[in-house]
């Protein structure tokens, strides 16, 4: 199971939100690059970066912080937040990002994902499927679409997407445990590389995800609140 330590950026700082609410923010570090170095030194082999300002603005906002992270670590980095066009994807890949996560645009115009996969290849493009009560959410989680998360995932598969980051918004940043039944259902029904996100709080959660053969998991607040030791998690599950 691939572990992805999360680094969420807002105003150039490393932060965590609770349930995706922008008025519920905790700042963990003034320098995202320092967090990236720390996680890599503790065994991280892939990092998950989120440009929260970008998610709201609809374009990349934290490029200097992203550039600094990439200059200091040698492991692959996936990035989400504010990537809404092929030009955005190209700019981020040119910076050195390994995989771009497309969220809002994937739900609003799924066929756009086919264009991206054809242009950049399936290993470079990830669909960010964010769900609220089973419905796909868009625009920095401020709105829900008319599609279920499963319908969106099946559409993504049809268009050549191989990687999905599935986030249960109601659990994100809450440390209440991930939505394992739904995540497992998505992985089994789609056959895609489903990366679980939202609510992971303990080694027990990782154990359950691993037992359910979930291919990957993003760990955020649990690392920052020291509920999960990354070296221990890497040794046990990766």
Model-derived features: where do they sit?
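Structural preference for beta-strand elements that scaffold enzyme active sites
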Residues: 2-6, 46, 74-78, 98-101, ...
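Active-site-adjacent beta->alpha loops and helix N-cap segments on the catalytic face
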Residues: 3, 54-70, 84-90, 104-126, ...
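Short secondary-structure boundary segments
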Residues: 7, 51, 104-105, 129-131, ...
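Conserved, mostly hydrophobic/aromatic
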Residues: 8, 39, 47, 92, ...
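Conserved anion-binding
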Residues: 11-12, 18-23, 90-93, 97-172
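N-terminal beta-alpha supersecondary unit
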Residues: 14-60
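Short, acidic/polar
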Residues: 28-40, 84-90, 145-155, 206
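Catalytic cores of alpha/beta
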Residues: 73, 77-99, 181-216
